[in-house]
Amino acid sequence: LDAAGVLPIPPYLNRETEKSDLQTYQTVYSKIKGSVAAPTAGLHFTPEVLAAIDAQGIGREELTLHVGAGTFKPVKSETIEGHEMHTEFISVRRSSIERIKNNLGKIIAVGTTSVRTLESLYYMGVTLASNPDATADELIVKQWMPYEETNNRLTADEALQNILDYLDRHQADKLVTATRIIIAPGYEFKIVCGIVTNFHQPKSTLLLLISAFVKGDWKNIYDYALRHDFRFLSYGDSSLLL
């Protein structure tokens, strides 16, 4: 793919890909190739910022979600039901899942990518509650799974323990599967308590996720950003939503 094509950059940058994008359109902690886009909230975290976080005794974990082309796919349908999410690859270490479980109520996700990954873990744990020997394909979180009442009865602690037990039974040190989760108004967050995120474009699933998290207060937040000349999108300003 590297030989046949070029790094895809957001279409709203209105320019061709440049060689420098291979370094600048990337987080400093990226390790695994696979995403079609950088998780742009992470672009704010320089080595110096990460060192300062560590010095404050703030724990951090790394996880993998290969961002799909659907990230740039605008919501064109009249209702959310008409929008189809793409499948995205997920990989999370067992040690990370255990640490998340031990720190529930304190989890801050860097970027909507991390939010989708972390919230998907809950529903994978729900699947394992009824199907302890589920295959990787059976663990894939379907788009509308979170909105079915029967899929929301476990605590986050119980769901994550199901994953840990599953990994132990399979003598695996990481969970590898995928998700098609859509997070939109009405969604109940199970794991994430805060989000570090940029300001997103209209008619995007990313803005739907933010609206779900701040329970409809996104208009006030975005109005403030516009009035104070905040920069939007990939190379824009960041925010901490709690």
Features from the language model and the residues they span:
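Surface-exposed, charge/polar-rich loops and edge strands
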Residues: 1-242
